[in-house]
Amino acid sequence: MSLLTEVETYVLSIIPSGPLKAEIAQRLEDVFAGKNTDLEALMEWLKTRPILSPLTKGILGFVFTLTVPSERGLQRRRFVQNALNGNGDPNNMDKAVKLYRKLKREITFHGAKEISLSYSAGALASCMGLIYNRMGAVTTEVAFGLVCATCEQIADSQHRSHRQMVTTTNPLIRHENRMVLASTTAKAMEQMAGSSEQAAEAMEVASQARQMVQAMRTIGTHPSSSAGLKNDLLENLQAYQKRMGVQMQRFK
């Protein structure tokens, strides 16, 4: 795996699924391929994106700044600086300075990532802030190692939280989660339908599922009643995809 592919993989792992993720993936590909060279416009676009957390925007802004060639005097952006200040915690800043001194002696991507993984996400973000604000300089490879370690720390905590939700025994949370999954599966079916022959059938199944979820939310139902809805919908989607020759993997 090339360095830029690895960076793209780690950065995208912390962005919630949806149309915005696809859009960001495209921007990253363009930036890494040297097709997008207007850093100012790129940062303005990033600043106004909804859904993304300030830290995610800060990390993306850092990656864009590292990759897109720009004039030396180009102003640093406040939204990136604020996101990469380690929540203003002096403890994070102290650790960031210690980490920076170690990274300064490092020259490889993997070496930098390895060193960085023993620090908290707050300290890692602060260290990125030091480099972003030109208070310290490291090689681009080392900076990317720092980025990937930060994303890994964030993705780990997101995964733990997701796993807790999936394995929860609280019937109300499980019920709501099944209904949300049914809604997103319905949306996926509608998007895939396009102009194929089976489009009408897919749209019909998706529409029924949406109405069912709406009704369940409006009148309230027993928490176990949504299990069948989600399973039926996934079976319908699988059958539809088989006919279309599309792999199911993407929706598991």
UniProtKB/Swiss-Prot annotation:
Q: Where is this region: Membrane-binding?
A: 1-164
* GO biological process annotation, one example: viral budding from plasma membrane
Annotated GO molecular function terms are: RNA binding; structural constituent of virion
The protein's topology relative to the membrane is:
Peripheral membrane protein
User: Which UniProt keywords are listed?
Assistant: Host nucleus, Membrane, RNA-binding, Viral matrix protein, Virion
Keyword Transmembrane helix belongs to the record = no
Which locations, inside or outside the cell, does it occupy? Answer: Virion membrane; Host nucleus
Q: What is its main location?
A: virion
RNP-binding as annotated region, ranges: 165-252
Subunit structure, per the record? Homodimer and homomultimer. Interacts with NEP. Binds ribonucleocapsid by both interacting with genomic RNA and NP protein. May interact with HA and NA. Cannot bind NP without genomic RNA.
* Protein name, per record: Matrix protein 1
Its source organism is Influenza A virus (strain A/Henry/1936 H1N1)
Encoding gene (name)? M
